[in-house]
Swiss-Prot record:
Single annotated GO MF: NADP binding
Protein name: Glyceraldehyde-3-phosphate dehydrogenase
Family: Belongs to the glyceraldehyde-3-phosphate dehydrogenase family.
GO biological process: glucose metabolic process; glycolytic process
Domain of life: Eukaryota
Upper classification of the organism: Eukaryota, Fungi, Dikarya, Ascomycota, Saccharomycotina
Subcellular location: Cytoplasm
Keywords of the record: Cytoplasm, Glycolysis, NAD, Oxidoreductase
Enzymatic reactions: D-glyceraldehyde 3-phosphate + phosphate + NAD(+) = (2R)-3-phospho-glyceroyl phosphate + NADH + H(+)
Length: 333
């Protein structure tokens, strides 16, 4: 049994909690969020505008949120170093704040007594792991790891299969990405990203993303071969990757589909999905795969030039991988 804590009870923190309490090998011992009281934590956990009502019992007392009869301690510390992770025997602290995403700041959880930390965001300093792609390279001496981003988790499995089978010489990615909490409900100040300050629900907003370049960190053979951008669109959840690649080996679209379908049923089962149906974004709400290939949407121009399309629930699919990585890190200890 792995003792787990969650720091940051936002979109990802709450979904990670839903998934974690459904796993028999995980014991959720605590949640920390400096801005949320236990009654409000219970309310936000119970009701979700996107993923629906929690299918279980939720209540609270002064110091706990009670999930299906199990008491989970709730803390309101701004500084993770002040949390009682040692006293609670925390094996893995999940940091889903989006703030403590570098080695020095995430190390506050180690100072607090946690044995390991999983960051639910890409990191410039912590090693990044994408389940189904490079988790086998994890070594137990690594105390702090990153689960990369939701988009990297969608793109990397797709790129790995294509690169292994046909070779990727270079590629450009566009993610058409649902709104997230960093965006604005109405036009407002956003000094680092002027476009990002525009009304999320009324615009298609071009944005930068490091997700494609990050694939080179989890798949070194693709270092420098991929880059990309994002369009933020007015949907609440589910996003889609459009990957256009120049291949080293001539092939047909049927051969590409066959390779992806084989991977989805074999080595990447549960990580990479595959469909030939005429689907739309809402069909993937609550899908636990990291990436679901839309075989009917892809196109080929020449034997070496192809566009591939793959969907992902950027909240639920990603949160599922966070919990998978926690289990992997704990088992490797």
């Amino acid at each position: 049994m792995v003792n787990v804590s969650v720091n940051g009870f936002g979109r990802i923190g709450r979904l990670v909690t839903r998934i974690a309490i459904s796993r028999k090998d995980i014991n959720l011992v605590a949640i920390n969020d400096p801005f949320i009281s236990t009654d409000y934590a219970a309310y936000m956990f119970k009701y979700d505008s996107t993923h629906g009502r929690f299918d279980g019992e939720v209540s609270h007392d002064k110091d706990h949120i009670i999930l299906n009869g199990k008491k989970v301690a709730v803390f309101n510390e701004k500084d993770p170093a002040a949390l009682p992770w040692g006293k609670l025997g925390v094996d893995v602290a999940i940091d889903s704040t989006g703030i403590f995403k570098e080695m020095d700041s995430a190390n506050k959880h180690i100072e607090a007594g946690a044995k390991k930390v999983v960051i639910t965001a890409p990191s410039g300093s912590a090693p990044m792991y994408v389940m189904g792609v490079n988790e086998e390279t994890y070594t137990p001496d690594q105390k702090i790891v990153s689960n990369a981003s939701c988009t990297t988790n969608c793109l990397a499995p797709l790129a790995k299969v294509i690169h292994n089978e046909f070779g990727i010489k270079e590629g450009l990615m566009t993610t058409v990405h649902s709104m997230t909490a960093t965006q604005k409900t109405v036009d407002g100040p956003s000094h680092k990203d002027w476009r990002g300050g525009r009304t999320a629900s009324g615009n298609i907003i071009p944005s930068s993303t490091g997700a494609a370049k990050a694939v080179g960190k989890v798949l070194p053979s693709l270092q420098g071969k991929l880059t990309g951008m994002a369009f933020r669109v007015p949907t609440v959840d589910v996003s889609v990757v459009d990957l256009t690649v120049n291949l080293a080996k001539e092939t047909s679209y049927d051969e590409i589909k066959a390779a992806l379908k084989k991977a989805s049923e074999g080595s990447m089962k549960g990580i990479l999905g595959y469909t030939e149906d005429d689907v739309v974004s809402s069909d993937f709400l609550g899908d636990a795969h990291s990436s679901i290939v839309d075989a009917a949407a892809g196109i080929q121009l020449t034997p070496t030039f192809v566009k591939l399309v793959s969907w992902y629930d950027n909240e639920f699919g990603y949160s599922t991988r966070v919990v998978d990585l926690v289990e992997h890190v704990a088992k490797s200890a």
